[in-house]
Amino acid sequence: MYEQAIVIRNDLKMGKGKMAAQACHASIQAYLHAQKISPSAVMYWMNEGQKKVVLKVNSEKELLEIFRDVNIDGLPCSLIRDAGKTQIEPGSLTAVGIGPEKEDKISKVTKNLKLL
């Protein structure tokens, strides 16, 4: 099975709408990256119903560690930096999108994270 994971910073105390927007940015950007580097994974994921899981971290440091590990493993990903026009400081790192890719490859990096 294939999935996409979105990891959101919980320490920024974004409103629900803001979190949803950041998750969407991460999802779309990771999807576009996956289309370039792993089109077959995208095809399988699309055919399987586009499973997504949204997880949380509690700091920028944790978010960057996830992003680093995902890159080391060669998974399609995105790192989202907010423009800062509404709730948070400009340039704040808010989310990481991972995949779509095989669940076991993603869970290797995200297995210790909790659901948002």
From Swiss-Prot:
InterPro entries: Pep_tRNA_hydro_II_dom_sf, Pept_tRNA_hydro_arch, PTH2. It catalyses: an N-acyl-L-alpha-aminoacyl-tRNA + H2O = an N-acyl-L-amino acid + a tRNA + H(+). It is an enzyme of class 3 (hydrolase). Keywords: Cytoplasm, Hydrolase. GO terms for molecular function: peptidyl-tRNA hydrolase activity. It comes from the Archaea. Signal peptide: none annotated. Its main location: cytoplasm. It is found in: Cytoplasm. One of its GO terms (cellular component) is cytosol. Its EC number is 3.1.1.29. GO terms for biological process: translation. The natural substrate for this enzyme may be peptidyl-tRNAs which drop off the ribosome during protein synthesis. PANTHER family: PEPTIDYL-TRNA HYDROLASE 2 (PTHR12649), PEPTIDYL-TRNA HYDROLASE 2, MITOCHONDRIAL (PTHR12649:SF11). Belongs to the PTH2 family. This is Peptidyl-tRNA hydrolase. The lineage of its organism: Archaea, Methanobacteriati, Methanobacteriota, Methanomada group, Methanococci. The gene is pth.
